[in-house]
Amino acid sequence: MSFKFCFPIDLVFSTATHLETGSFGKATGKRISYRVIADCHAINNQINDEWLVRDAGGIVQQLGFSSADFAHQQIRNEGGVNSCIRPFTASQDVKGPYKGKGNDNEWGDLFAEILTSIISGKSDIIHQYYDRAGKGYYPENKMAVSFSEIEAFWMSFRNALPSAVFTIHHKIGREDPFFPPRAAIRWSLVGKHEGHGRFGQQTNAYVHVMGISHAEFGPWGLRNEYTLFDDIAIWKQIHLHEGRE
């Protein structure tokens, strides 16, 4: 049995052209690019379990929509609040064959400490462990450079869900010849939208966020971080709570 986790060097960067009418609306002919992270388990070179996050918010923004507006339109297109497809939550999770939690590695442990501290509101850890010239690649096709921009992303996200429960479901770190130390974590944040931040004014909607984060470390700290979650799925949960059709 072998386990494969896609690290930052394997992070999928996709390009596409919106040529046909479908789930992203009427064809626009626009060329877009977006990131995908997949946490995969394989046996005999065949993937039999996978967790995947696609930057859907980044896709729709390039097509001219906000994540909030697209989620609202998606509910309408799917028949309204009572009939639409529900966003993914833990209750819908189908248990697959992979039961592992990752490996025991100092880089995975360090990245877990960093993320846990950030979600707990201890943003000073960014100054402590990130490279001053470090970059963060975030949902909605955003890039942040250095402490202040990275901190702004995380605090806006954290402030929207201040009492939500952060859980690490999978943690792995690696050191390989000719590669920098790196780590990958699959996590969830579950709780009420009871703060003003990334998702606007508080609504008290109960929200489930599935995220995956990758880190690449250099001699001066964490130099490249990749975090993805689906903004549209989060906004859809908020709209459904509010009964918006």
Question: What label would you give each PLM region?
Answer:
Residues 1-245:
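C-terminal and inter-domain tail/linker signature
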